[in-house]
């Protein structure tokens, strides 16, 4: 009888026992914190982003799209990293700018880069279109959000394919839409009204006009957004491909600064 009981208990070695809590061990490939798994602690998730980037601006023009983002990585309110790029070239027809957590942006860059390599290895003459990248990002962001482990980013995707300009938005919840002008972060309050004001009067802009407007908005953001910086990149996509310029800086004028008081 004792031998029978021992043989039965051996089937559950390391498994659940009557009157005790049992934590199901993680499966291979599951995203469980090793420390949490070892000590039976709750699964942890990112509650707040650490190093963050502020606004990204996007604007369509006749024959392409322009995107701009500054090069500051803020650690809370500290201007910690002042020479980081928040714009990436995805392929010859697509570019992407991201605000929010910089580590999550680096992760997405790695994933997208590998996707593009895998597509090119097929050698079938096809590549991801801007709309395809935008659609994939909506699914990826919504998937992570549904697992209660979101990527803390808001992204602007710009591209030019089949004779059409594309400008799309995706946030950390998977919310997505397309628009002639886009702005994330503080730029949604300060820069987007300036972009829309011009587009309402002149719906189709030239490349030069679009660039001048974006540079003006970057200057306004530097004046008014405490998390912005006067060093930025401007990326342009046309039928010729993607071109990223920078670091650039805007001319500023602080002559009236001594007249502003009462906001201390």
Swiss-Prot record:
GO biological process: proteasome-mediated ubiquitin-dependent protein catabolic process
Taxonomic superkingdom: Eukaryota
Modified sites of kind Phosphotyrosine: 102
InterPro entries: Ntn_hydrolases_N, Proteasome_beta4, Proteasome_bsu_CS, Proteasome_sua/b, Proteasome_suB-type
Entry-annotated residues carrying N-acetylmethionine: 1
UniProt-annotated location(s): Cytoplasm; Nucleus
UniProt xrefs under CDD domains: proteasome_beta_type_4
Propeptide, residue positions: 1-45
Key words of the record: Acetylation, Cytoplasm, Nucleus, Phosphoprotein, Proteasome
Pfam families xref list: Proteasome
Major site of localization recorded for this protein: cytoplasm
Listed GO CC annotations: ciliary basal body; cytosol; mitochondrion; nucleoplasm; nucleus; proteasome core complex; proteasome core complex, beta-subunit complex
PANTHER family: METALLOPROTEASE TLDD (PTHR32194), PROTEASOME SUBUNIT BETA (PTHR32194:SF6)
Assembly: The 26S proteasome consists of a 20S proteasome core and two 19S regulatory subunits. The 20S proteasome core is a barrel-shaped complex made of 28 subunits that are arranged in four stacked rings. The two outer rings are each formed by seven alpha subunits, and the two inner rings are formed by seven beta subunits. The proteolytic activity is exerted by three beta-subunits PSMB5, PSMB6 and PSMB7. Forms a ternary complex with SMAD1 and OAZ1 before PSMB4 is incorporated into the 20S proteasome. Interacts with PRPF19.
Family recorded in the similarity comment: Belongs to the peptidase T1B family.
Function: Non-catalytic component of the 20S core proteasome complex involved in the proteolytic degradation of most intracellular proteins. This complex plays numerous essential roles within the cell by associating with different regulatory particles. Associated with two 19S regulatory particles, forms the 26S proteasome and thus participates in the ATP-dependent degradation of ubiquitinated proteins.
Designated name of the protein: Proteasome subunit beta type-4
Species for this entry: Bos taurus
């Amino acid at each position: 009888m004792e031998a029978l009981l021992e043989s039965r208990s051996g089937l559950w070695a390391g498994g659940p026992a009557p009157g005790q809590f049992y934590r199901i061990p993680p499966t291979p490939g599951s995203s469980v914190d090793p420390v949490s798994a070892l000590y039976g602690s709750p699964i942890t998730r990112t509650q707040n982003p650490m190093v963050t980037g502020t606004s990204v601006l996007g604007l369509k023009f006749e024959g392409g799209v322009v995107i701009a983002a500054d090069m500051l990585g803020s650690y809370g309110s500290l201007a910690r990293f002042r020479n980081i790029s928040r714009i990436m070239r995805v392929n010859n027809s697509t570019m992407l700018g991201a605000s929010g957590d910089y580590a999550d942006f680096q992760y997405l860059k790695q994933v997208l880069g590998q996707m593009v390599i895998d597509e090119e290895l097929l050698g079938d003459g096809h590549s991801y279109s801007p709309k395809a990248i935008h659609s994939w990002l909506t699914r990826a962001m919504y998937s992570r959000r549904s697992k209660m482990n979101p990527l803390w980013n808001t992204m602007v995707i710009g591209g030019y394919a089949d004779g059409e300009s594309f400008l799309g938005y995706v946030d950390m919840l998977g919310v997505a839409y397309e628009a002639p002008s886009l702005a994330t972060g503080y730029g949604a309050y300060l820069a987007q009204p300036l972009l829309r004001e011009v587009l309402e009067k002149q719906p189709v802009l030239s490349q030069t006009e679009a660039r001048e407007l974006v540079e003006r908005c970057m200057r306004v953001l530097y004046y008014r957004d405490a998390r912005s910086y006067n060093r930025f990149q401007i990326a342009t996509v046309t039928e010729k491909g993607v071109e990223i310029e920078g670091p650039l800086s805007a001319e500023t004028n602080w002559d009236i600064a001594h007249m502003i008081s009462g906001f201390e």
